[in-house]
């Protein structure tokens, strides 16, 4: 164990192979293993309800409420301030960028997502297999599945669409708003 910072790994009882650096980093972690938590309150609730293993959370509040309420969070990489903040029990996610995959509230269990960029997929809750790369790409996705968006604000309003592809600045920007769905749609270029 390596704990540097006020109340870093504060609650540890039977954990090993963890690194926590920063104010209250890994604060609630009790028995989880193989986690790297760097930043103020990074992984703060990790290990609260069950054993969460093999996570990397770097940035202030990155993964702050992971494992806060229900199940364990495993195999996640959250890099950036607030990346994956409310991702309660999601597994195998990669969120890179400020507010990437931030989510809201507890009970979020998105799995197997790749969200890269400032606020990429920031509203995600239970969506799975989402790929979003770009500034606010897939910004509003909550429960969508298997969508791919590449570009500035691509699929911005697509909350629940499935299997859509958007490539380009604002590609598919309006779909998902006002009852529209981006189910199986393909958007190329700017809109």
Regions found by a protein language model. Name each.
Residues 1-191:
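Glycine- and small/polar-enriched repetitive beta-structure motifs of secreted/surface proteins
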């Amino acid at each position: 164990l390596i704990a540097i910072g006020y109340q870093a790994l504060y609650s540890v009882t039977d954990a090993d192979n963890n690194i926590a650096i920063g104010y209250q980093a890994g604060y609630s972690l009790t028995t989880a293993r193989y986690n790297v938590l760097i930043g103020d309150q990074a992984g703060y609730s990790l290990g609260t309800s069950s054993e969460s293993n093999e996570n990397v959370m770097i940035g202030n509040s990155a993964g702050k409420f992971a494992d806060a309420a229900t199940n364990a969070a495993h195999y996640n990489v959250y890099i950036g301030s607030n990346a994956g903040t409310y991702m309660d029990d999601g597994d195998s996610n990669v969120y890179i960028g400020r507010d990437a995959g931030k989510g809201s509230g507890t009970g979020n269990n998105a799995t197997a997502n790749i969200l890269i960029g400032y606020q990429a997929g920031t509203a995600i809750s239970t969506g799975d297999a989402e790929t979003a790369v770009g500034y606010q790409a897939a910004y509003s996705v909550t429960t969508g599945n298997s969508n791919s968006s590449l570009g500035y604000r691509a699929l911005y309003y697509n909350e629940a669409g499935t299997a859509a592809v958007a490539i380009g600045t604002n590609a598919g920007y309006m779909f998902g708003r006002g009852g529209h769905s981006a189910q199986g749609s393909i958007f190329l270029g700017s809109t």
